Amino acid sequence: MVTLHTNFGDIKIKLDFDKAPVTAENFLNYCKDGFYNNTIFHRVIDGFMIQGGGMESGMREKATKAPIQNEANNRLSNKRGTIAMARTSDPHSATAQFFINVADNDFLNYRSKEMFGREVVQEWGYAVFGEVVEGMDVVDKIKKVKTGNKGFHQDVPTEDVVITSVSIE
């Protein structure tokens, strides 16, 4: 169990080591290292998700460890209250940034290889690795904050939403 202590309250997360062992261990290691302390939720979109884990106040990006393998093919869905890894367009680029789904976001799920004409297309999706077990009221407060643009970043809270510390039990 991991608790994100924020300036809005606590969010307790149960990690799924059975279905997402690499991703859960990666997140836990960042927690143990104190990496998430004093980072911000830097992207907040009501009706979608709240994203954090990589930026400090002022949108300063933190250096991360190497990317991990995408484990989205684990039958876990991006439903409300789940936590998943953020990444770039490269399916295997997740490092430290994560998001908590504030709605059911099935379009983010892994889709198996499908035949489209002569082409086989695979939708990698975003790897879910846990679920909020306490503190969805805190997540729901965060999703309502006022946002704007900061540099080339969009949907940035106008006042910092800070992960002050993380505890592990």
Swiss-Prot record:
Its EC number is 5.2.1.8. One of its GO terms (biological process) is protein folding. GO terms for cellular component: cytoplasm. Keywords: Cytoplasm, Isomerase, Rotamase. Pfam families: Pro_isomerase (PF00160). It is found in: Cytoplasm. One of its GO terms (molecular function) is peptidyl-prolyl cis-trans isomerase activity. It catalyses: [protein]-peptidylproline (omega=180) = [protein]-peptidylproline (omega=0). InterPro entries: Cyclophilin-like_dom_sf, Cyclophilin-type_PPIase, Cyclophilin-type_PPIase_CS, Cyclophilin-type_PPIase_dom, E_coli_cyclophilin_A-like. Residues 1-168 form the PPIase cyclophilin-type domain. PROSITE patterns: CSA_PPIASE_1, CSA_PPIASE_2. It is an enzyme of class 5 (isomerase). It comes from the Bacteria. Its main location: cytoplasm. PPIases accelerate the folding of proteins. It catalyzes the cis-trans isomerization of proline imidic peptide bonds in oligopeptides. Belongs to the cyclophilin-type PPIase family. PANTHER family: PEPTIDYL-PROLYL CIS-TRANS ISOMERASE CYP38, CHLOROPLASTIC. This is Peptidyl-prolyl cis-trans isomerase B. It comes from Haemophilus influenzae (strain ATCC 51907 / DSM 11121 / KW20 / Rd).
